[in-house]
Amino acid sequence: VLAVLVLLVAVLVGWEAHRELSLDHRLSGVASEIAGRPVSVDCPGFLRGLIDLGGSGGSVMFDANGKPSNTTHLETSVCHDLSDYGATRKRAEFSCVFGTTPCSDRVERAVYAVLVLSHESQHLRGVQSEADAQCYAIQTVARVAERLGSPPAEARAVAAHFLAVDEPLMPTDYSLPDGCVDGGSLDLDPQSSSWPTG
């Protein structure tokens, strides 16, 4: 009986490790594209997830010279919502992203998780300022949503929804700076009039 229990635990731990590595690999590809260099995304596994207190969504460390690390560490809840993004976006309730009113908690968490991956990718790109990273993240969140399975129109709607509904609720450090407008100093694609997705 004990041997069966040990085997069952080993299989479950192995399966969880495989899922975690698969998600990390998938998200690392997306983050690398946004960051413009090879980077890694680290989602906590089961054991680390038990002690994850949450708070900021993710983090990237910078050295004393302002150089970013090669890895972002995402919170358990963000990783879960990114892992579940494909299933969430297929639900009828996801169509609410095409509007400007709050969606269900599940959809809002999915939209936020996509934004967090986009935001942390900006830090991996070398952007230290939270406000500037947020501005750039809003402009690349549609690309992230597409890489996670959204068709282009839906991906643009995710970006527009976050900007209209969720961004005003963000902490002050993440408030969009003055240059974060179409044609502004932080516009990643100033030739395009399509804001925020370029």
Go through the PLM ranges and name each one.
Residues 2-3, 10-20, 24-61, 66-69, ...:
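Metalloprotease/metallohydrolase-associated module, dominated by Zn2+-dependent proteases
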Residues 59-113, 121-124:
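Active-site scaffold of zinc-dependent metalloenzymes
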Residues 111-138:
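Active-site recognition of the HExxH zinc-binding catalytic motif
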